[in-house]
């Protein structure tokens, strides 16, 4: 069924920034004593807010200083300002949604500044969302709670049950399920975590217009 609205995660869905951020994160956590296999870190940390990452990393054994979140954000912003490419096929998806007159928004656990840095590198991209760019950090509860997705649905004046969420993390897929929304899981490499949270996986953004019933 064609959705009435689409809500995108940002990192790893619109902009190919997640690998950049995660490489920096893994290296940084190692300096504070957390040396775990990458697959374990991805399973435990991807999709969380940075405050959530810090809390989880401490439970896993990282000896993080009190100012770690702010310090890491400074390093991350500096790295992302060097360039964060779009996920291939994203503009094709937005063009198809525009042609079908289907509204869309962003619902991310990333900070507003982070999204401004990554999205703002691509001319006209922020404007295409018409102010509908929302951070879970501005909500009462971030993902895996549904607050940011429900807020986005209200902003577009659509029933949550008619929305589709595009996510790449189990945390985000869980939030979509809690919001009563269908989740399409962008999974070019690993699908198990998204499947476990009820997402419908796909591997290429170029396939998404067809999967959404737009063509």
Task: Set out the residue ranges of the language-model regions.
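Asp-based, Mg2+/Mn2+-dependent phosphohydrolase catalytic module
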Residues: 1-4, 95, 111-215
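N-terminal helical cap/lid subdomain that shapes the substrate entry/recognition surface
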Residues: 2-10, 14-100, 113-116
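Short linear functional motifs in flexible/disordered or boundary regions
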Residues: 24, 37, 53, 65-66, ...
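Short glycine/proline-enriched coil/turn segments at helix->beta-strand junctions
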Residues: 59-64, 100-102, 180-181, 196-200
